[in-house]
Curated annotation (Swiss-Prot):
Protein family membership: Belongs to the krueppel C2H2-type zinc-finger protein family.
Source species of the chain: Mus musculus
Name listed for the protein in its UniProt record: Zinc finger protein 827
Protein role: As part of a ribonucleoprotein complex composed at least of HNRNPK, HNRNPL and the circular RNA circZNF827 that nucleates the complex on chromatin, may negatively regulate the transcription of genes involved in neuronal differentiation. Could also recruit the nucleosome remodeling and histone deacetylase/NuRD complex to telomeric regions of chromosomes to regulate chromatin remodeling as part of telomere maintenance.
Pfam family name, one: zf-C2H2
Amino acid sequence: MPRRKQEQPKRLPSHVSRQDEAEGDFSEGEQWYGNSSETPSEASYGEVQENYKLSLEDRIQEQSTSPDTSLGSATPSSHTLELVALDGEVLRDSLQCQGHLSPGVSSVCDDDPPSSNKPLSSNLRRLLEAGSLKLDGTANGRVESPVNVGPSLSFSPPSHHAQQLSVLARKLAEKQDQSDQFTPSNRFIWNQGKWLPNSTTTCGLSPDSAILKLKAAANAVLQDKSLSRTEESLRFESFSSPFSSQSASSTLAALSKKVSERSLTPGQEHPPPASSFLSLASMTSSAALLKEVAARAAGSLLAEKSSLLPDDPLPLPSSEKKPEKVTPPPPPPPPTAQPPQSLELLLLPVSKGRASKPSNSAPEEESGKPFQCPICGLVIKRKSYWKRHMVIHTGLKSHQCPLCPFRCARKDNLKSHMKVHQHQDRGETFQCQLCPFTSSRHFSLKLHMRCHQHFLRTEAKVKEEIPDPDVKGSPHLSDSGCLGQQREGGGTELVGTVMTSNTPERTGQGGAGVAPLLVKEEPKEDNGLPTSFTLNAADRPANHTKLKDPSEYVSNSAAVLFSQDISVKMASDFLMKLSAANQKEPMNLNFKVKEEPKEEESLSMPLPRSSYVFSPEPEVSTPSVSEDPLTPQEGKGSVLRRDMSAKAASELLMKLSAESYKETQAVTVKEEPMEVDIQDSPASISPSRNIGYSTLMGREKTEPLQKLPEGRVPPERNLFSQDISVKMASELLFQLSEKVSKEHNHTKENAMRTTTSPFFSEDTFRQSPFTSNSKDLLPGESVLHGRVSAPETEKIVLEAGNGLPSWKFNDQLFPCDVCGKVFGRQQTLSRHLSLHTEERKYKCHLCPYAAKCRANLNQHLTVHSVKLVSTDTEDIVSAVTSEGSDGKKHPYYYSCHVCGFETELNVQFVSHMSLHVDKEQWMFSICCTACDFVTMEEAEIKTHIGTKHTGDDRKTPSESNSPSSSSLSTLSDSANGKDDSDSSQKNKGGNNLLVISVVPGSQPSLNNEEKPEKGFECVFCNFVCKTKNMFERHLQIHLITRMFECDVCHKFMKTPEQLLEHKKCHTVPTGGLNSGQW
């Protein structure tokens, strides 16, 4: 094959000193070693696999070149080419080694003259394929060769890594053949027939120094932020490199790239493709040297990974574990004094990979690591809690009850369980009479009874828990059941029952016998009715025998104690007893149970009279009626007595009496009697009988009661039998205290007879369960209806002579069929039923809003910035719903384009448009009622009506006797102009301040002709009322917050400043109302 023509290199100038060349080359070496490249080369090591295999023809062509030019180094003259062939090869290899491994020697590529690179490439390929380099320094007598690599090189056999290096070298050599253009430089000097470098630095190559250079090159590659790898698929196959997950060949390729980029002079502006690219073969003596360097580096790092030996040439610093932190390198120091710490921060990631955990890690509890349950995944912070939680899954129950087989895992659950046995020791069991629920704990039954509170019932049974000396309210209603017994140290046993019957007449008008205790539901609306105690006796004896002493009144129910009909003297005696108890005086309240007939015998025999007596002499023996054991027939209707602590009752009386006194001063409440039927007892009962009252249900009594020791205060019980509300308790006790204080009675009577305001009717407020509306009834009729006022009650007390009038049972429960709420008045139920219908009779007079109840309408009116008086709402509703005769007199009406609202009243329409935003307030029109004429100017519609519809009977607002409804200013003139000399209208600055004060002389001027017939008619809306005071309050709706009117658009402002700002918008055309005066 013909030889390729070789170009002779230009001869370098001989006058340039070697020292200058060395200094320039030294400075370039500093720049290469320390700084990162800002002009990345286009050639990348990622393109190696593109030309992995060279074509056979190219390789044969390259191998067939002449040996004269096989070195790839042209000589200045042709006759010296053969003489320096071998020396040039050795010298070039040494220089290339210096350019790669020594910071003081730069690249060789820029120094070669532009010549053909084919012989050099073929020679390098042959060297790499051979896998070894034979250096024969004595062949040409050149013993002074600067290459001194013999002692430090130990060649390893070819490996997979060496093959990759060979492929990389071939790839880079081919790149050099295609795009490498050499430029003349002063890096080599021709001296004595051969090329000599301008630097005398020798290359002392060792594996340790090679490792340093490799790390420095990797550091430079990592610093190059502009380097972007476009093809991830062109990587080499995985190789376990000690540097990182990348292979060592990738590191070496990056090294060659950085060397080629640093070899450019600062003044050279060639693009990266035109710059010289140094092949791997020119950096080292052979591929074997590269292979050995990689092997030594891997061995060094692997040895360091296992253990840090002190004799390691370059131990990896701790900063290598954080390869992500990339900092710019410091300014480059001289290459001879380059410190190793500059390489520490920017080395490639070590193949150690995973950072080892610190050896001094704290225990789990000390470090705060949470504990997680492996079964349910619950995360717990403390180990003790975690162990306790694991008991749930393991099933270990270490706590066992000593009295039963009950076991639990937690101690607090065992303590709660032991309370069951405490009640069982006393023989107590609590059972619900409305369902099969049974509990040994009273509190559980009390909670259970809440599920029955929304259903009407005439009887319910709750076993009473004998509490500690605390007053607790709990429901106690029963037919038959277990009896609570409390065994005290003295052997005292308290036993009692209450008599009830299961007749179906208890929910109606009553039946024979003593009725059960009825529980009235408390509605959630309008101060609902509290619980009431109702007892019925249809067969009560007609005659009422007066007892000898007021202290002889005995009762079997706690309800009669707080009823409204006890006498003043009896209440006084009771309060005196309570006062004595508060003074630490011993008072024995021994309660005995009186006889009650059977339910079957109630129709044939008279029922005993209910009364109660406080017995200060407990030693006095009582008749045999209560002390004898009860017969089986009498046992079924026996009454369970319960004692009441005098101290607890007194404290509750004083507290609730004070609260009721405050309530009396705040608002007047009418009285209404309680639904309590009092049974009369024969006069044969001893006056010294001890009191016995209770509402507890229990079993039959089988033995007489024993008296408490003298001076011993019985344990405190619940004051009330049912779980009544605080309001009812306060009202009950207030009635008792009211009987004692006659001043309170007179104050209440006077307050009930008079009402100060004509606008507040009796039905406006929710009445108390003790109030009465039957003022006009006779005393007998009042008794039949179960409602008696306070004065009539006193009359009945005086007539009966005993303060215990007879009450007829009256069922006042009115349940709602829709939601189940129960009310005590039919009027309240009727008002409540309106919520379940679709009727909305409460309509807003300013907009189409309608509400079901009055409160919602009042709430809605706040949108219009109107402070409405509650009494005006009904009149407004009646005026809006009624069709006024003035509706046909308006010749035009206003229409809102936003929501379609239409009205004939200007003020009403302005109030409506104020609900919209500013942009929407101009979207309206004024329409003629007689034709289809539409305009936005009120002056135009008036002109239209005056010319087109003059013969119509309808009158315009300006022609009517009443003031114009289109302007508030005309209203102020008519309202304050005639006979009113005290009130005046103040107009300052054209702000039209409306101050309307209707006085007796001014009102006839509004509607002189129609006042006797229609009353007071509002000129702003269809409101009509009959009283002047109500009309005055209604005018405040329109005038209290809108006092300043715009004479252009009739919009109202609250302050003069706002009106001035608003008028400015009429001076500029806005597309809405024009600024016309009319």
